Amino acid sequence: MTQGLDVDGARLERGRYDLWVGTEPIDVARVAAALEDESLGGVALFLGRVRSPNDGQVVSHLDYEGYDAMILATMASLADEARTAYGGTDGRLLVAIHHRLGRVRPGEVSMAVAVAAAHRAAALAACAVVVEEAKRRLPIWKLEVGDGGARYVAGAAVAGEVL
């Protein structure tokens, strides 16, 4: 695969993963296509959407900010760690992580994580851990704007297993 800039945002593809960050809407079909491998029978997909209300406040939108190169490097680390932990003895695990930057409105997808593994248990476990670690480690800041004003909010990672 190749490394380079997409029309919008940055994309890094390196054999076993597909990573993207940009301001255009996330293409869920493209995320799923990155996992096409008939030898892998378990596929797990997580879509994170902006919600409203949040903490009792109506949300107009979230403004996501981040540094593309640093985000992609962190995504690559997450994908490599997942492959090591859940890819079995042959490392057979495909990972796609896409995150949107800029203005994202309620109902729109801000993050997609998908994992394909030989079996469903590994795919589901790896997907869950990548989502939680992405929320914790990606250098992305989000400004929530709504009827209560604007405030920076932290990613709500759930305490649990770490890669």
Question: How would you label these PLM feature ranges?
Answer:
Residues 1-109, 116, 124-128, 132-163:
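N-terminal, polar/charged subdomain of small-to-medium soluble alpha/beta proteins
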